[in-house]
Amino acid sequence: GRIMSKKNPITVSSWTLGDQCKFEDRVIAAKEAGYEGIGLRAETYVDALNEGLHDEDILAILDKHDMKVTEVEYIVQWCEEHRSYEQKYKEQMCFHMCELFNVGHINCGLMEDYSVEHTAQKLKELCQRAGKLVIGVEPMPYSGIPNMEKGWAVVKESGCDNAKLIMDTWHWVRANQPIDLEVIKDIPADKIVSI
């Protein structure tokens, strides 16, 4: 096999490849563009199943093109008191995908704006459901966790070893956020799961 970029593969986001292509076309496009891994959302995985593919077929396509799934996403609405069945199913699907593709973390976002205390408690509950998987909280400027400061406060207060942060530079650049590394100087490096 090919040696990936040190231990962290260069991954193309599921969103970059859209949602209007067949699974194998997604893999081929990523490979031809030079990526070492692809991200998959629960929805794009279900799309592959709806093409008539089974888990074994998906793994065979990845192997055929020397590609790996290196990112699983996207759990949302995890702070709601009464989560919908759709969100519960999606969460379980993400757990299954991590096991299937040997991915250690799940990207999670939160559009709703709650207090740090409430969000940290709900993150703790999500982390407990996730077991050994890492929950990567992704701050986005237009979300309920709009910056690294609130993200870190939530992750820290949750007290969970498997709660970490994701730093998505695309969101910051697109939202014209200041590039100031001071915002992460107090965050231990091992609490950032993905950049």
PLM feature spans:
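Aromatic-lined glycan-binding groove of carbohydrate-active enzymes
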Residues: 181-195
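Short glycine/serine/threonine-enriched helix-capping/active-site loop
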Residues: 72, 108, 195
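Active-site acidic/histidine proton-transfer and metal-coordination neighborhood
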Residues: 21-24, 61-68, 78-167, 174
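Histidine/acidic-residue-rich catalytic or RNA/ligand-binding cores of hydrolases
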Residues: 147-148, 177-184
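Short gly/pro/ser/thr-enriched loop/turn and capping motifs at secondary-structure boundaries
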Residues: 46, 171-173
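N-terminal pre-domain/capping segments
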Residues: 1-103, 160-164, 190
